[in-house]
Regions:
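Aromatic-lined, polymer-binding surfaces characteristic
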Residues: 1-131, 141
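Pocket-edge structural micro-motifs
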Residues: 222-223, 235-238, 264, 292, ...
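Carbohydrate-active enzyme catalytic cores, enriched for enzymes
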Residues: 58, 99-261, 429-430, 434, ...
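Short helix/loop capping segments that flank catalytic or ligand/cofactor-binding pockets
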Residues: 229-232, 242-244, 261-263, 270-272, ...
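CBM-like, beta-strand-rich accessory domains located in the C-terminal region of large
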Residues: 47, 154, 160, 171-181, ...
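Short, conserved secondary-structure transition motifs
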Residues: 35, 102, 131-144, 381, ...
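Secondary-structure boundary elements
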Residues: 66-70, 81, 117, 121, ...
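Extended active-site and interfacial segments that coordinate phosphate-rich ligands
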Residues: 239, 248, 262-280
Length: 488
């Protein structure tokens, strides 16, 4: 409905359709809308499909001046309900896929624009929803202006849709994440008043660059909002729907506007294509697994066989450092259960310490995955990796690990594959285990140091571990404990 009506509106600026043709289109669209009004079930209440369906009905009602009929009142009521239950308090769509979140936002913006064009007041729930999703887009936007390829998402520029949010709401903070002027795409979407007023909206940058979207479990650690800024996205939230992937404890890393560590994308929805499940699995994300077992499992294109339960996240952001941690219960079913936990300490502007902690009492094999952007070349040097792109990053570990590099495929755009690399590390250990990974653009030295009690007794690494990082002329001591500190 929406595309038909938008096409008609464009042509009607310079062309008059004959009555017979217009009647034919109306009958066809009405027949479709009658079905959309009648077919509405639990799936559509929760799915992005339902939002698209109701927005099409509302657009139909506006164009044909049917706002006093069920074609308008029923879908508007349904849409209000959908916005309340599909959009989390932090502005993220519950299906955990930015691509589909923004399909929903596109349609909601279309409805709001129709309200303006037809001199109706935009309902408050629409403004709230546009604001919530717009701000979550601003939080997730990389220095390259693209969304992370979370779930079933492509490498898509977010500036145009954020620009439309800013224009409709007259929001200067959202404008800072969009274009300074209305872009070509948005000219076709917005009403004339919003386009005219956009230059007068003052641009306001957020006070703090790092942002926590707590309800969805998405955290964004930054040193600035500039194109040459540093960015880390950490994910530890619900899997969402069939669009969700096994990305618990995953992180993206972008240094000076260049992608280094990424989500591998989606590629296809074809049931029998093995790449579909391959890109949904744990190893296509920068996370950890235990004993070669996947913490979440999938079947065919849409089936979720098992989904690990995420635990509550904790974060602390300030001007000097950012910290975030998360965990999940995906390995409680092992004969000897394990609780994986990841802690990320970002010492601004350009040092990242990744702590992978595994609480258990038995012996297990622990594996880390690091999936690289297709423009990054990795090289193994002793117990470290050099990542080479336009910039260079050094990755080093506190322990001697088995490190290998594998050829993989990633997908930045639907139906397209790119060749890339995956770094895999393996570590066999008994009891509570901590693996520390340090990443910096400057070469550095890392060494384990002893942890002792007040009586000078040595503390076992199963209980606590510390490292010393020598960087430039500085020494950084980093400590992690797997047990509660007591008076022993």
């Amino acid at each position: 409905c929406i595309n038909w009506i938008k096409t008609l509106e464009i042509f009607e600026k310079d062309y008059t359709f004959d009555k017979e043709f217009k009647t034919k289109i109306f009958k066809s669209l009405k027949q479709q809308c009658d079905v959309l009004l009648e077919v509405y079930d639990d799936f559509r209440i929760l799915s992005n499909w339902g939002v698209l369906q109701n927005c099409g009905l509302i657009t139909f009602a506006f164009y044909y001046h049917l706002t006093d009929t069920d074609y308008f009142s029923i879908p508007l009521k349904r849409l209000k309900h959908q916005c309340a239950i599909q959009i989390l308090p932090d502005g993220v769509h519950w299906e955990q896929s930015p691509m589909y979140q923004n399909e929903v936002l596109n349609c909601i913006l279309e409805v709001a624009i129709n309200f303006k064009k037809h001199k109706f007041s935009i309902p408050p729930f629409l403004k709230r929803t546009i604001s919530k999703i717009g701000y979550s887009n601003m939080a997730m936007k990389k220095p390259s202006h693209t969304q992370p390829m979370q779930g079933d998402s492509d490498y898509t520029d977010l500036r145009d849709i954020i620009t439309r949010c800013a224009a409709i709401l007259k929001d200067g903070t959202l404008k800072s994440a969009g274009y300074s002027e209305i872009d070509f795409e948005s000219i076709w979407e917005l009403d004339e008043e919003s386009i005219k007023n956009y230059p007068s909206i003052p641009t306001n940058y957020p006070k703090y660059p790092s942002m926590a979207l707590e309800e969805s479990g998405n955290f964004f650690l930054r040193n600035s909002f500039h194109e040459d800024g540093n960015y880390l996205w950490f994910s530890c939230g619900t899997i969402g729907s069939g669009h969700g992937h096994a990305n618990l404890l995953h992180f993206d890393l972008n240094y000076q506007g260049e992608d280094f560590l990424i989500d591998s994308g989606r590629y296809t929805y074809v049931e029998e294509n093995p790449v579909r499940v391959e890109l949904k699995n744990c190893y296509a994300h920068n996370t950890t697994i235990v004993d070669n077992e996947m913490f979440s499992k999938f079947k065919c294109a849409w089936g979720i066989v098992e989904a690990a339960l995420p635990l509550n996240n904790y974060y602390k952001f300030n001007k000097n450092f950012d910290y975030v941690e998360g965990a999940h219960l995906g390995y409680l079913n092992l004969p000897n259960p394990v609780i994986p936990m990841r802690k990320i300490f970002y010492l601004k502007p350009e040092l990242w310490i990744i702590v992978d902690q595994f609480n258990t009492s038995g012996e297990h094999k622990y594996t880390q995955f690091f999936n690289l952007d297709d423009k990054i070349t990795p090289t193994i040097e002793n117990n470290s990796i050099i990542l080479q792109g336009k910039n260079t990053l050094f990755m080093k570990w506190s322990d001697k690990l088995d490190i290998c590099i594998k050829d993989i495929q990633i997908s930045k755009e639907y139906n397209n594959l790119q060749s890339s690399k995956r770094i895999t590390t393996n570590f066999l250990n008994s009891g509570a285990t901590t693996i520390m990974t340090v990443i910096s653009p400057k070469d550095f030295k890392i060494e384990k140091i002893e942890v002792r009690r007040g009586n000078n007794d040595l503390v076992n690494e199963n209980e606590a571990k510390a490292i010393k990082i020598s960087l430039d002329n500085d020494e950084i001591i980093f400590f992690n404990s797997t047990k509660e500190i007591n008076n022993q």
